[in-house]
Amino acid sequence: MEENNKANIYDSSSIKVLEGLEAVRKRPGMYIGSTGEEGLHHMIWEIVDNSIDEAMGGFASFVKLTLEDNFVTRVEDDGRGIPVDIHPKTNRSTVETVFTVLHAGGKFDNDSYKVSGGLHGVGASVVNALSSSFKVWVFRQNKKYFLSFSDGGKVIGDLVQEGNSEKEHGTIVEFVPDFSVMEKSDYKQTVIVSRLQQLAFLNKGIRIDFVDNRKQNPQSFSWKYDGGLVEYIHHLNNEKEPLFNEVIADEKTETVKAVNRDENYTVKVEVAFQYNKTYNQSIFSFCNNINTTEGGTHVEGFRNALVKIINRFAVENKFLKDSDEKINRDDVCEGLTAIISIKHPNPQYEGQTKKKLGNTEVRPLVNSVVSEIFERFMLENPQEANAIIRKTLLAQEARRRSQEARELTRRKSPFDSGSLPGKLADCTTRDPSISELYIVEGDSAGGTAKTGRDRYFQAILPLRGKILNVEKSNFEQIFNNAEISALVMAIGCGIKPDFELEKLRYSKIVIMTDADVDGAHIRTLLLTFFFRFMYPLVEQGNIFIAQPPLYKVSYSHKDLYMHTDVQLEQWKSQNPNVKFGLQRYKGLGEMDALQLWETTMDPKVRTLLKVTVEDASIADKAFSLLMGDEVPPRREFIEKNARSVKNIDI
């Protein structure tokens, strides 16, 4: 009871001050990751996360983000409102302290927040430091307060009470990024929509609104998912055929003791999962709403529970004998879509990226929660239980049969030329940091590329026709495919679950296909393979797409190369009186070696598009939709996006 009373008291004593703000503008990258597009969006998330924390604590029911022209960014919630009394340490108003002192926030007072993704003051002061204008309105007990800052956190006057308000409680923060520090680039609506919808799924019952007023036709979005993770699973599996209709889900809050530390934590675990008829696993994990893309102890606990329960039921129901090889973690995850979300007051992460959860006390807790709900489901639904066991046994059998083929793709040394595919024209250097692999469509274009390349650092691997669609294939089919085997051997890392990034032979892997429909299909097949089986290469930014020209314009003894119809029309409108010859390239094979080098392979003049993934769950849905078996959703997607297909951003 005493603990609950403390949590309900939110005043200046709840805000702990740790250090000053001076370093933020000098080294912004240390605080928000970068000064570019990613950092710009990070500023939004710092303020949004404060509001989400209020909602997670049960103090707010809605969060609203509004974007106006000229980068005016506004976040509103109906939480408790930042305390307005004088802070005992700074002798300034607590509102001013929160937005001007780095790490002055409720995060460091466990009575104010039990868990946190971002907190009043923790990131808010950083956003203020990187803003040219920063304003805050606080509503407490039907009174309205206002404070403003400019030029990186310089306060303009004291906190003022502007009178009474119909709004009982809450906070509004409005800021404009300072582009003398930040690089100017537009907010991306797709990135914002993706993250806000994800937050709505992860925090059931909270309404999140987004109003984008930057265009002539304002757009608004609103999300509220009372089903939480169950609705998230339905959303992710929308383009896949489920093995059964029910989503297995549970949530539990327990007090656990930290391993090797005399501390107890109240941890909330939420899980939801469903099997489908594909061969790919889609497991997404979160800690305090932050995507732990590299997994961690919560994912380990989840997988261990599946292995334990499925093997036990397989033996008890005579699918396996005690002496048989048991189903492993890869087998049980084939065709599985799962969300694991935990709320922890003191998360610990492994490595510098902070994308892998390291709290050891989480593993047995998640294992226990998943084991209990999964065992109950298997007992109460014997038909579905048998379907799960049969699917995992098929995965096990395919894995066994693929072992021999898999060994062929492994190489003791990434530079062991005796293990390289015969059609690979390798480069001379053994330095992976400068070497490049061009994956070229067809033997003809491959031959031209071999002649035109700089053989010191550029390797060429021609592919014969379209590679296997891995979205519809199991392990055995994939490992027995000649083109994929050649690709895997050339790159040198193996594929999941045995992927080893340190064995990568080339820093750039460049997909070079014709600029036609077939070329686009081959490119998509390759991207599907990389996303499903070599995801770290996508995540680390090693995959690129070459941009061969579409046209050659010849005039006055000059040759110009154009990559798009728009470029050609622009040139024609700017040169209305120039007589010129025009050649349209239907494929790479129509260029000679010198032209291919000068237009597409020479690092001094070429254009390469780096393949990136902003949200793995969205990319997962896109590949399932475009490359899977379900025709109606694919037709709907194409009809909806046909006119803007060139702008699809995976």
Curated annotation (Swiss-Prot):
Biased composition (Basic and acidic residues): 400-414
Cofactor(s) the protein needs: Mg(2+); Mn(2+); Ca(2+)
Site for Interaction with DNA, residues: 466, 469
Enzyme class: isomerase
Subcellular location: Cytoplasm
Highest taxon above the source species: Bacteria
Domain Toprim: 435-549
Catalytic activities: ATP-dependent breakage, passage and rejoining of double-stranded DNA
Protein function: A type II topoisomerase that negatively supercoils closed circular double-stranded (ds) DNA in an ATP-dependent manner to modulate DNA topology and maintain chromosomes in an underwound state. Negative supercoiling favors strand separation, and DNA replication, transcription, recombination and repair, all of which involve strand separation. Also able to catalyze the interconversion of other topological isomers of dsDNA rings, including catenanes and knotted rings. Type II topoisomerases break and join 2 DNA strands simultaneously in an ATP-dependent manner.
Assembly and oligomerization: Heterotetramer, composed of two GyrA and two GyrB chains. In the heterotetramer, GyrA contains the active site tyrosine that forms a transient covalent intermediate with DNA, while GyrB binds cofactors and catalyzes ATP hydrolysis.
Protein name stated in the entry: DNA gyrase subunit B
Organism: Mycoplasma genitalium (strain ATCC 33530 / DSM 19775 / NCTC 10195 / G37)
